[in-house]
Amino acid sequence: MASQTVTERLRELAETVGVSTGFWDWYGNWKHVEDASLVAVLNSLGFSLSSEPSHGEIDEAFRHNEDLVWLAPLPPTTVCRQGNEAEIPVHVPHGMGVWCHVETEDGQHHELQQLDRWIPPRMVDGNLIGRATFKIPNWLPLGWHRIVARHEDGSECSSTLVVVPQRLSSRLDDGHKRWGVAAQLYSTRSSGSWGMGDTQDLADLAAIVARNGANFLQINPLHAPQPGFPQENSPYLPVSRRWASPLYIRPEAIDEYVHMDSKERGVVTRYAHASRSHEDIVDRDLSWKSKIKALRKIFELPRSISRQAQFERFCAQGGESLENFALWSALVFENGDIDLPERYASIDAPGVEQARQRLASEIEFWQWCQWIVFDQLIRAQEGARRLGMDMGIMSDLAVGVHSKGSEIWSMPDAFAPGMSVGAPPDMYSQQGQNWAQPPWSPRSLAQMGYAPLRDMLRSVLSYAGAVRIDHILGLFRLWWIPEGMGAQAGAYVSYDHEAMVGIVLLEAQRAGAVVIGEDLGTVEPWVRGYLNDRGILGTSVLWFEKDGGGWPLWPDHYRRSCLAAVTTHDLPPTLGYLEGAHTELRNELGLLVEDLDQVRDADRIERERMVSRLREGGFIHEDDPSEEELVLAMHAYLAASPALLLAVSLVDVVGEKLPQNLPGTNAEYPNWCVPLHAFNGKEVLIDDMAHCDRVKRFLTSVDRYIR
């Protein structure tokens, strides 16, 4: 057998540690990942390879990778399903006795049985290391536990044990179909909004849709943006996914506001008016500039004993994570830019601890902002549930965070250095995509006991009865792009999906929440099957569900375990789509690379096929249905499918035509800044929706379809 080349050996190393050495392109061709990309990705995972590694270097990397397992007394984290037995290796100096037990989160103590299994010892760094294998029983309770190894010399070590559900148990287990409304909260304003939709608008919108039979209100991610200016418009590029955006606070709904005298209230009212000067756009900078002034005034007001106790409890629960987020916020706001100077560049930078003392009051302000926004979100959810929504708010979880955000500042070890997340080339983006978001390091996550994932989920689920995970494939693998290379020069890196999905299930089940995974696009078939088996719903969009001939898929061929929708935030509202407004808009902006007439023809054929399906299925009967009748018929079509959840976009309810987001654009279009408009081009306020015949007619029709 011929010896392997350096490239072959490098690829073997990559595959061993979960780095794919190739991928299928959109033409169905297998594309190899270049050696330089593999070296960069491997080094980000903790190896130390030169740019052109030798056989000896790669052999040493293999040994190092194997030695790491033996040098760890216990695996950093063990995740197992309840009801399944598992085994855990324990490493000790060869010949030393060792005993293991589990300490459950509620304080119980369970000794583990050592298996009668001989595994030859291994020489590591001149020391002979032995391995003992212990059995984890199948009857341990769900939860976050500790495995403790006790050595005969009296020393101890421990690691994380997470027992997770086999399958998520949720309210959907009753088999009943449910529906709800999907809205971009920032765009859904009222006469009381500060230039953008907020928590009070969320509560009021939930009340409107609940009265008409909706079971949930799906919204955009509410993750934290940077505290200063300019504000990031995209809700999918936060600085932290654990903490929330104070832009969504309604100042007048803060309990302490009622204690303001008339003069102080007048000042707050003027701030509110100043935030509303842009009626045709959602101006986050303008809104935040006014709102933060009001928040600082309210922050200075005295709090009752019980309110102060609630604030202190929130800070204690948030712990170091909240304090560090608040410290980072204070530093960035003081600096006036998200690019901090060297003395504050990371949590362990030389000036940080001194700043922590100097900015104590400012840190408390940013902690208080988090307390207020979470308090208002939780109240909105409680109100929705009281009105009969069995899920209430369905929040959204973004793929990642800003490369200069608070998460990478405060826990840099959790992220893969020198890497960015994106997507390989496809027919829509032939150079690939770079999302400028650092990926979590799979090895670091395990070392940290998956605490970042757990804490993020707990925060989001504290105010939501359901969560949609954007790009859920990211729990299985992500496209890593080395710094300085093009998006096409990346590689897929695998994550321990069994552990990560299991933790999602555990936290969701404890919160009584439903989980939906956004699994649109290219997803390996086994992934959808795996998620379905674990109780996570997929996502189906009417325009994307086609049969082999390119016709709309018949309703009875849809998945049962999914959230079905006619459109999404990355597509135009249905009226705009039916009119081809998205094509005309892209043409006007000079973004259309295909022939305009050909694209118009393709749009026309797609519309005609949809109308034909609707007629053939008996969903429309009129020769010339109105726009509203046509859009309703499309929702009736989806309601006839087995899909457990149906999401109705608020833009379709009111007859909006403008898209919220035009993928592939930046300055060309005001993405994520378009206020909600009706079919007549006028802005629709929540105040109007409460008494709007069209809104009531649309929602009650959908409720009738589902029931």
Task: Kindly give the residue locations of the regions a language model identified.
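Structured C-terminal cap/extension of enzyme domains
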Residues: 655-707
